[in-house]
Amino acid sequence: MIEKLQAIEDRYVELSQKISDPNVISNVEEWRKYVKEHAAIEDIVLKYREYKKVLEEIKATEELLSSQDEELKEMAEEELSQLEEKKEKLMEEIKILLLPKDPNDEKNVIMEIRAGAGGEEAALFAYDLFRMYTMYAEKKGWKVEIMSANKTDIGGFKEVIFSISGKGAYSRLKYESGVHRVQRIPTTEAGGRIHTSTATVAVLPEAEEVDVEINPNDIKIDVFRSSGHGGQSVNTTDSAVRVTHIPTGIVVTCQDERSQIQNRERALKILRAKLYEMALKEQQREIAEARKSQVGTGERSERIRTYNFPQGRVTDHRIGLTLYKLQEVLDGELDEIIDALILNDQAEKLKNMTLN
């Protein structure tokens, strides 16, 4: 471990020299590459330097233990205990920094929420989840844009697809994929019985054109007239677009925009994200077979969280976390849950790093 850290620090010093070298600066592409690498390892190097400083302090303090002065010796023992604790803490932090980074963490996301079992109540819950993520995004300073929505007459969503753009969006929202369950008394329920409904959330990293190349011969594009609630026409032109990816059978429909071009662009953006997710899942299949992650990003069929209204309770089943802050969570206060999921995920990866 120490040898690896020293090698990283040596590389950091080398990169520091390169990015201030006029010959390198004149080649913008090369300079950017070095700056990116330099930034990627900076946190590890700074933490390692802090660790080395503590080692020096431990060595100096240990020398005081041989002192004849009992008071000085006692002070040294107390300080040594604190330094050893600090050393262990720094090493744990370094290990976390050394964990492989998810290359998609800095990407924007495309989220899909679909009403599951529970009819109208499930559609209302899908809306509640959409509102929760929208409010969370606002708190983070991220931008939300609805790409496609299938609304119900009483204000729910049968399905809603939306993008969230902002720094680190995927790194925090990726843990939301899976089946979310709600337990509450519907407003339409006269008998006051608690109903259980579900909604499925999918979180896809937004794919750039360089990530996924779509062969024009592999897609079929149909245009038709947009329709609103009850099938009434909302547009007199064929502006709605249905894109079918022939090799996979994936179908994406967009009709929210008045322009056929805008709907086509949105449909292709969603398709690109879905194809990228398929490729990622294929890559991760072998890893998943070797190590079943307790948290991961959650299989879509996996029930991950329950929102219990009578008890004001939210329970994340993957880590056994229960919070009696239902309204706060639904108002976008998600950090406490997400931070706990990230810590658990890191602990699992550290355990595997040790085993390997």
UniProtKB/Swiss-Prot annotation:
Keyword Chaperone: no
InterPro entries with a match to the protein in the record: PCRF, Pep_chain_release_fac_I, Pep_chain_release_fac_I_sf, Prokaryotic/Mito_RF, RF-1
Entry-linked PROSITE patterns: RF_PROK_I
Description of post-translational modifications: Methylated by PrmC. Methylation increases the termination efficiency of RF1.
SUPFAM superfamilies assigned: Release factor
Keywords of the record: Cytoplasm, Methylation, Protein biosynthesis
GO CC terms in record: cytoplasm
Keyword Cytoplasm included in the entry's annotation: yes
Name the record gives this protein: Peptide chain release factor 1
Organism the protein comes from: Caldanaerobacter subterraneus subsp. tengcongensis (strain DSM 15242 / JCM 11007 / NBRC 100824 / MB4)
Lineage, opening ranks: Bacteria, Bacillati, Bacillota, Clostridia, Thermoanaerobacterales
Encoding gene (name): prfA
